């Protein structure tokens, strides 16, 4: 996803409020744990992108931020919402550097849930873990991991170890954790 961002002044509350009122989202780009730039993201463009995004996929989405004539590849590290309207009011981006490891959550997608044996026998499919915490290089980031639940019967589970994890991803979460279960109703 490509975003054109503009520079902004530092964090005066009145300035941040004005940015939000004019259709912007205040944001910060971090690199190596240090603040690199204070920026503004177009709220309309970002909200439109969010509405089309699959649930949980934001954490593994790589953004190309067009900032002062250069492209910065980054992940959203933190997002703040307004409590009552659930509008995005602040973003933190983490710059991706090719030779540096990054920690992120990769969403887990259950496939063939409609054909699940346990569900056809009257069971209820419940996904316990929705994302896997991993460490990897930026080139190894995948948008999601798939877990096939077609053969899952009543009272059976699938663990993180049952997911085909690509070679470049190193899981932080223990692989013995249960991802999905089919229980009797």
From Swiss-Prot:
Named from the GO MF annotations, one term is: 5S rRNA binding
Q: Does the keyword RNA-binding apply?
A: yes
- Domain of life where this protein originates: Bacteria
The yes or no answer to whether the keyword Ribonucleoprotein is present is yes
- Supply the Pfam families for this chain: Ribosomal_L25p, Ribosomal_TL5_C
Q: Name one GO biological process term.
A: translation
Q: Which UniProt keywords apply?
A: Ribonucleoprotein, Ribosomal protein, RNA-binding, rRNA-binding
The record's GO CC annotations read: cytosolic large ribosomal subunit
Q: Which CDD domains does the record associate with it?
A: Ribosomal_L25_TL5_CTC
What HAMAP family has UniProt attached to this entry? Ribosomal_bL25_CTC
Give the record's subunit note.
Part of the 50S ribosomal subunit; part of the 5S rRNA/L5/L18/L25 subcomplex. Contacts the 5S rRNA. Binds to the 5S rRNA independently of L5 and L18.
- Function of the protein: This is one of the proteins that binds to the 5S RNA in the ribosome where it forms part of the central protuberance.
Family classification: Belongs to the bacterial ribosomal protein bL25 family. CTC subfamily.
Q: What is this protein called?
A: Large ribosomal subunit protein bL25
The major lineage groups are: Bacteria, Pseudomonadati, Chlamydiota, Chlamydiia, Chlamydiales
Chain's gene name: rplY
């Amino acid at each position: 996803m490509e975003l054109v961002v503009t520079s902004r002044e530092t964090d005066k509350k009145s300035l941040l409020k004005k940015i939000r009122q004019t259709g912007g989202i205040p944001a910060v780009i971090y690199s190596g744990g240090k603040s690199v730039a204070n920026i503004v993201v177009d709220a309309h463009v970002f909200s439109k992108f969010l509405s089309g995004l699959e649930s949980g996929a934001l954490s593994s989405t790589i953004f190309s931020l067009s900032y002062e004539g250069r492209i910065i590849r980054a992940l959203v590290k933190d997002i703040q919402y307004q409590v009552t309207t659930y509008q995005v009011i602040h973003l933190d981006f983490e710059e991706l550097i090719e030779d540096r490891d990054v920690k992120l959550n990769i969403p887990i997608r259950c496939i063939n849930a409609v054909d699940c044996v346990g569900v056809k026998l009257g069971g209820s499919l419940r996904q316990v873990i929705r994302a896997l915490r991993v460490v990897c290089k930026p080139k190894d980031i995948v948008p999601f991991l798939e877990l096939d639940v077609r053969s899952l019967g009543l009272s059976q589970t699938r663990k993180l170890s049952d997911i085909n994890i690509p070679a470049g991803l190193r899981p932080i979460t223990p692989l013995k954790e249960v991802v999905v279960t089919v229980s009797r109703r």
